[in-house]
Design a protein with these regions (language model features):
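Cyclophilin-like peptidyl-prolyl cis-trans isomerases
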Residues: 16-311
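Sec-dependent signal peptide recognition
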Residues: 1-9
Length: 311
């Protein structure tokens, strides 16, 4: 009887509870990407040709690095909104000449190209710092633009672009993501063991598992092929076995310090622009002479933000 009464009491307790207030569904990301277009997709060259001058942003020379190889120039745009201390430190290192006669010391297939002050890796900087506190994420801030993509992402609640950089965010924080061309800070196992004396660029399929585990400070906007086409290292993790195999560059300089006549002035399409929204949509709903089945969605790292010579 006690068992029956106990069961009855439990049943009554469950039945007599007041109805729970329906849980509101989380707000969906607000995106300016339009719905499925009718007919064939416009081409990216057509979209860019119709863009206006105001839809392009000049890449600031003060936040640009030139990595000078005999074969050409790799240009890196820095992201002070997301890694202000590392950006400042890398510029200080460049200005003190720390990077002169450096080299690419690691090229791991489908992963990264990494470079350092190879002539004397243990030499301490004179002005810049060897290590800094990690800047894996930053607090979410409505004053920093974030152009949301409408499609779900495996690694983050929301993804999109912040000032033309691929980025992600959750309820409290924001961070830059590891897409092709992303530039990050090499470190050891300890989170605060890097500072910018060693840097890397992603040259393969996007290793998004690195997000929020390494400080990201920029992206390659021109010349990535000079890194991605280098011979692969044969030692562990793609390092070159011998210094003779290193691929050397003459220097890394802040573009603002380079005479105007020697600069490569660039513009990037604003990711809050109507033309960029059209560009994303033409890739989400790609339908042309070759593509017959549009997917209706796109991954963050499958979108390349256009860059052009300054006009």
């Amino acid at each position: 009887m006690r068992v029956v009464l106990a069961l009855a009491a439990l049943a009554c307790a469950a039945a007599c509870q007041p109805a729970a207030t329906p849980t509101a569904e989380p707000a969906k990301p607000v995106s300016n990407i339009p719905a499925q277009p009718e007919g064939l997709s416009p081409s990216i060259p057509e979209i860019l040709a119709a863009s206006t001058a105001g839809e392009w942003r000049v890449i600031d020379p003060e936040n640009t690095l030139y990595m000078e190889f005999p074969e050409g120039r790799v240009i890196i745009e820095l992201a002070p909104d997301f890694a202000p201390n590392h950006v400042a430190n890398v510029k200080a290192l460049a200005r003190e000449g720390y990077f002169k006669s450096g080299a690419v010391t690691r090229v791991q297939d489908n992963y990264v190209a990494q470079w350092a002050q190879a002539a004397d890796p243990e030499r301490l900087p004179k002005v810049g710092q060897k290590t800094l506190k990690a800047e894996f994420t930053r607090p979410r801030d409505t004053n920093i633009g974030f152009d949301v993509l409408p499609d779900p992402d495996t690694y983050a609640p929301e993804v999109g672009f912040s000032n033309s950089f691929p980025a992600a965010r959750d309820a409290s924080s924001m961070w830059l993501t590891h897409c092709y061309g992303t530039v990050g800070v090499g470190r050891d196992n300890e989170p605060d063991s890097g500072g910018g004396t060693e840097l890397y660029a992603i040259i393969g399929q996007s290793p998004r598992g690195l997000d929020r585990n390494i400080t990201v400070l920029g992206r390659v906007v021109q010349g990535i092929e000079l890194l991605s086409s280098l011979p692969r290292g044969t030692a562990e993790l793609g390092f070159y076995e011998k210094p003779e195999q290193y691929h050397r560059y003459t220097d890394i300089r802040v573009a603002a310090d380079v005479p105007a006549a020697e600069r490569t002035d660039l513009q990037t399409l604003r990711t809050d622009s109507e033309s960029f929204a059209k560009l994303v949509n033409t890739r989400r709903w790609r339908k042309d002479a070759f593509y017959h089945v549009p997917q209706g969605r796109i991954g963050l790292c499958n979108i390349n933000v256009p860059v052009r010579a300054a006009q």
